């Protein structure tokens, strides 16, 4: 099954969906998990062959998510998964006959003295979906075990029990085991990988809060179990082995965990910073832990390093600093005669700066956090909340979007989440979508990105003096125009010329953007880019297809205004000025994603409610399909070819129009009318002209009209035949040309029933009725169409 990753741009193949069951862990006051635990330890703590398989981990997490109560929201389901992982893996022994064995039972023959479950096929008539009945046997050999995660009954309201206890056996504990099928096994070395998926949807602060709440709720009996699994989530066993010798000190363990969580929030290029932190902590832990847990009110002095190095680190770690000659913030440090201020949420970063620059701060034994006699649970809670304060995101990604896969989900997941409007075909961020499709009933509009403006910061490898020293950060220092990939990059540099802001104007996909950054780095002295980038402006263009009376988009509109330099009508929707050109072509500036969809949907609502709109569903669907096949707008000549071919087939063949339409749709789907996006007629974008050359970009098809060259797209690139006819000069046409045009108009008269289309035809035909060959053409066409006199007459 395909799982789509929106953030990691990764597509993997995973297994199917499995249904989980619940099994009690305590029956008739007998704890069934005690004796089997020792034989299961080797399996849980040993290396797993699936830990290096990301598809297996994704499949395991997906099934944990799907086997949660249906009424829970996305974030609440993640909280439930976290609670299951904190309670950890468990095993319930059972004895079963060969003919009753099923996939949820794993072989592990041992002898139990306290008790084991003897399981057999359900023979009672209880109205439930249980598969087995059971009885408790003591001093009996166990043949199999149920493996899964420990949980609580109140959490697993929708998890079906596997065993019916209508006989004397009575489960008497609030704890149950959520058991997995034999194909799925969970081991402790999978915990960091599961945490990696969890942190996509919930923050580290949420994880700490849930952990502390769970310790308080379940009491001291399970505190040790929860803390152990909490450490495995953050791969504590590996960190302790490689960084420090293990010391059973609660403070030290928590500090190590918090620092490793902090590393997850920054980029891998900052390894040199944290390597020095680890080295100094491992060398003299007591000295540097005092700096690490220093209060925000203290103001230590840095005596090594340079101001440039401090700014460089702050930029790489994305830490905001303020500078002044007086102490203005509570959390600050002093360098020479200047004070450097941090926000109170960044106190841990200030303390890490102190360790990095090896600050000598007075060490008081009585105030050392290691020496303060505080209870472990309180100390644990305080340090967790103090060392790291992550900002919660306002929105979380919905996990269900990652499991969309064209009807391959089982019935339960489909009923739980409903149906989706579209399949996820790409894993590109919404800001970098090259085409956005908006569907509303019979209308479908494809909005194509014409260009986007992206802001990103960069750091230079070395100091290069390319600008005057008085230059401030808001002036352009350099401007680059690349042919491949096509982009224009403006550089805004600081006076030190180490940290720069890049303003990128480009058209293309997310992959082309990453490619462009690497090309830029090859031609400049850029050391690294401080991602993520910000798309601050995105412009899109769209065509309304199948609209016969195209002028309706620029007529009978309220609250619009016209530009003076070129004929463009502006509509204002949600404070966005949407420009309508000739022939139902529009541009939408500044917005992308959901904002773009909202603007276009309101324009579609105008089309649906306007009484003068005449809409051809076949032409609409055919051109929309052609756009989606080629992923770019249809050039002028390609559209005219398809339109004239359709009209000629309808006029020259006596077969039904539906057959012609079906034939044309088949040709479109087979790629007969495909085109290249490099066939665009002209452009004003400088970097696109740099690729093809200005001569090619200005090479627009022209015709000789009234001894002048006229561009064919002067009526609009999306113009249909009726729009062309409305601008023709009848006196300059030959008799044969007029005859052909009148035949086409008669065809439209016979097939257009809407008032808007009839009004348009009236205006066009009146022009032709005043021509010098009017009587001849009128009599010729009426004789050829005498079967239907009502439609042969021109409307007046």
Swiss-Prot record:
It comes from the Viruses. It holds the Pfam family Herpes_UL87. Belongs to the herpesviridae UL87 family. InterPro entries: Herpes_UL87_C, Herpes_UL87_N. This is Protein U58. The lineage of its organism: Viruses, Duplodnaviria, Heunggongvirae, Peploviricota, Herviviricetes.
């Amino acid at each position: 099954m395909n799982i789509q990753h929106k953030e990691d741009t990764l597509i993997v193949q995973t297994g199917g969906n499995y249904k989980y069951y619940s099994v009690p862990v305590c029956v008739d006051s007998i704890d069934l998990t005690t004796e089997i635990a020792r034989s299961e330890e080797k399996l849980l703590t040993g290396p797993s062959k699936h830990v290096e398989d990301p598809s297996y981990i994704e499949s395991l997490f997906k099934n944990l998510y799907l086997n949660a109560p249906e009424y829970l929201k996305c974030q609440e389901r993640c909280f439930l998964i976290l609670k299951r992982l904190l309670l950890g893996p468990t095993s319930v022994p059972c004895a079963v006959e060969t003919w009753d064995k099923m996939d949820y039972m794993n072989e592990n023959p041992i002898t139990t003295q306290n008790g084991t479950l003897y399981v057999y096929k359900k023979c009672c008539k209880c109205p439930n979906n249980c598969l087995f009945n059971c009885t408790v046997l003591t001093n009996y050999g166990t043949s199999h075990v149920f493996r899964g995660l420990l949980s609580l009954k109140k959490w697993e309201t929708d998890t079906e029990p596997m065993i019916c206890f209508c006989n004397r056996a009575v489960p008497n504990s609030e704890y149950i085991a959520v058991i997995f099928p034999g194909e799925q096994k969970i081991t402790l070395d999978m915990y960091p990988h599961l945490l990696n998926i969890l942190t996509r949807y919930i923050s580290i602060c949420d994880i700490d809060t849930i952990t502390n709440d769970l310790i308080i709720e379940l009491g001291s009996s399970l505190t040790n179990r929860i803390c152990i699994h909490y450490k495995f989530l953050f791969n504590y066993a590996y960190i302790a082995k490689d960084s420090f010798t293990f010391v059973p000190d609660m403070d030290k363990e928590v500090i190590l965990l918090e620092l490793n969580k902090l590393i997850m929030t920054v980029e891998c290029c900052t390894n040199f910073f944290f390597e020095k932190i680890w080295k100094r902590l491992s060398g003299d832990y007591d000295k540097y832990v005092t700096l690490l847990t220093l209060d925000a009110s203290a103001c230590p002095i840095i005596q090594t390093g340079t101001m440039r190095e401090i700014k460089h680190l702050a930029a790489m770690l994305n830490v905001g600093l303020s500078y002044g000659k007086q102490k203005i913030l509570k959390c600050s440090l002093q360098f020479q005669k200047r004070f450097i201020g941090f926000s109170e949420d960044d106190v841990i970063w200030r303390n890490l700066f102190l360790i990095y620059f090896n600050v000598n701060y007075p060490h008081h034994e009585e105030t050392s956090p290691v020496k303060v006699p505080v209870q472990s649970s309180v100390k644990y809670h305080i340090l967790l909340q103090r060392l790291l304060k992550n900002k919660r995101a306002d929105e979380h990604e919905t996990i269900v979007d990652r499991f969309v896969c064209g009807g391959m989900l089982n019935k339960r997941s489909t009923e739980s989440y409903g149906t989706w409007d579209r399949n996820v075909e790409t894993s590109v961020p919404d800001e970098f979508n090259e085409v956005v499709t908006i569907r509303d009933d019979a209308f479908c509009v494809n909005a194509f990105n014409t260009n986007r403006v992206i802001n990103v910061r960069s750091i230079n490898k070395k100091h290069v003096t390319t600008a005057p020293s008085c230059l401030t950060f808001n002036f352009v220092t350099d401007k680059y125009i690349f042919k491949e990939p096509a982009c224009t990059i403006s550089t805004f540099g600081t006076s030190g010329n180490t940290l720069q802001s890049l303003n990128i104007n480009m058209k293309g996909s997310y992959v082309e953007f990453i490619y462009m950054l690497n090309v830029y780095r090859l031609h400049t002295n850029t050391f690294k880019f401080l991602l993520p980038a910000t798309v601050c402006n995105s412009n899109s263009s769209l065509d309304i297809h199948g609209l016969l009376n195209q002028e309706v988009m620029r007529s009978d509109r309220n609250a619009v205004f016209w530009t003076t330099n070129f004929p463009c009508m502006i509509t204002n929707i949600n404070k966005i000025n949407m420009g309508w050109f000739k022939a139902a072509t529009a541009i939408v500036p500044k917005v992308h994603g959901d904002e773009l969809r909202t603007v276009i949907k309101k324009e579609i609502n105008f089309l649906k409610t306007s009484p003068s709109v005449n809409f051809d569903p076949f032409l609409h669907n055919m051109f929309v399909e052609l756009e989606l096949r080629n992923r770019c707008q249809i050039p002028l000549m390609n559209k005219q070819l398809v339109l004239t071919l359709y009209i000629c087939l309808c006029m020259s063949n006596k077969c039904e129009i539906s057959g012609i339409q079906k034939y044309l749709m088949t040709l479109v789907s087979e790629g007969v009318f495909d085109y290249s996006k490099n066939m665009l007629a002209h452009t004003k974008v400088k970097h696109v002209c740099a690729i093809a050359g200005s001569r090619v970009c200005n090479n627009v098809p022209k015709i000789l009209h009234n001894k002048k060259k006229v561009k064919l797209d002067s009526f609009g690139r999306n113009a249909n035949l009726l729009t062309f006819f409305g601008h023709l000069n009848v006196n300059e046409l030959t008799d044969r040309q007029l005859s052909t045009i009148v035949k086409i108009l008669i065809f439209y008269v016979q097939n257009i029933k809407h008032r808007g289309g009839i009004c348009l035809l009236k205006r066009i035909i009146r022009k032709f009725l005043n021509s010098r060959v009017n009587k001849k053409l009128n009599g010729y066409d009426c004789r050829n169409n005498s079967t239907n006199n009502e439609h042969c007459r021109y409307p007046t």
